[in-house]
């Protein structure tokens, strides 16, 4: 910081709200580097080494001929479609197939795996009904 800045800071009464925020000024949970991925590492001598594999690469699809625009106006009318419910999802995906099997008399309640029913969720990464965890 320059000399003039230090003099001006000394003349101002009250809290210094224009000072830069450092880890000493914030709470214990304050981390200056939070929110950005590291793209390298610091050596023991303090030099930063950039690692090419750690740099994020954004893959953007080719949007030539794409009709939609990336901006939705706040003046746009609200959607008219009803929100998705469990019953609506069931009737759109599995319902017609079960109705067809009921009409053909080939429906068996013990053979629900045919329609995508999973009796257990063992081995799944995301469980539908996880147990309550201790907080």
UniProtKB/Swiss-Prot annotation:
What are the UniProt keywords, alphabetically?
Apoptosis, Cell cycle, Mitochondrion, Ribonucleoprotein, Ribosomal protein, Transit peptide
One Gene Ontology cellular component annotation held by this UniProt entry: ribonucleoprotein complex
Q: Which GO terms describe its molecular function?
A: structural constituent of ribosome
Q: Where is the transit peptide?
A: 1-13
Cell location: Mitochondrion
- Subunit and interaction comment: Component of the mitochondrial ribosome large subunit (39S) which comprises a 16S rRNA and about 50 distinct proteins.
UniProt record similarity statement: Belongs to the mitochondrion-specific ribosomal protein mL41 family.
According to UniProt, the name of this protein is Large ribosomal subunit protein mL41B
């Amino acid at each position: 910081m320059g000399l003039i800045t230090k003099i001006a800071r000394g003349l101002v009464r009250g809290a210094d709200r224009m000072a830069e925020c450092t880890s000493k000024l914030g709470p214990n949970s304050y981390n200056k580097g939070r929110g950005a991925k590291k793209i390298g590492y610091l050596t023991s001598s303090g030099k930063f080494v950039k690692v090419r594999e750690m740099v994020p690469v954004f893959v953007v699809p080719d949007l030539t001929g794409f009709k939609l625009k990336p901006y939705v106006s706040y003046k746009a009318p609200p959607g008219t479609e009803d929100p998705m419910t469990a019953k609506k999802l069931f009737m759109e995906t599995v319902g017609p197939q079960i109705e067809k099997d009921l009409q053909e008399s080939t429906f068996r309640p013990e053979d629900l795996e045919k329609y995508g029913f999973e009796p257990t969720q063992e081995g799944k990464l995301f469980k539908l009904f996880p147990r309550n965890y201790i907080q």
